[in-house]
Amino acid sequence: MALNLVGWNVVLDSDNADELSAFYEKLLGWTRFPGEEFTVLANINQKGFPTWITFQQVDNYVPPVWPATTDEQQQMEHLDFHVENVEEAVKYALSCGATMAGIQYDEGWRVMIDPSGHPFCLLPPPPWIK
């Protein structure tokens, strides 16, 4: 048995959910739907069921540390964005307000940090989707 999905999303905590959703709106070109409790950013133009990111305001939010250490806040998840050109994507992400992580583990992809401290990766497409 499998779930009968009608969509899926990931939730990102932030001490400034509005700013973080605006960053991803610019980075991804998705549509933002502000709400009272959450802000949602959705890819409404894709085929099939929709994908969206929910941004949750957390007043005592502690950003994760990259790379992880045992004595500081660790990431609970991270986003991977597969792009046609990693270096162009890095330049664009930087112009949107991301920073490049100080430590990179591979030459083929880049770890970036969003304005709330969440790491995300920019990678080439995997071979199975080409």
Where are these regions (language model features)?
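A short, acidic/glycine-rich surface segment
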Residues: 61-67, 130
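Tryptophan-centered motif/residue detector
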Residues: 30, 38, 65-76, 109
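Short, acidic, Ser/Thr-enriched surface-loop or helix-capping motifs
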Residues: 114
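Acetyl-CoA-dependent GNAT
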Residues: 57-60, 125
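Mid-chain, well-packed structural core segment of small domains
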Residues: 68-93
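N-terminal beta-strand motif that seeds the catalytic metal site of vicinal oxygen chelate
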Residues: 1-22, 34, 74-83, 123-130
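Core segments of cupin and vicinal oxygen chelate
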Residues: 2-4, 11-58, 89-111
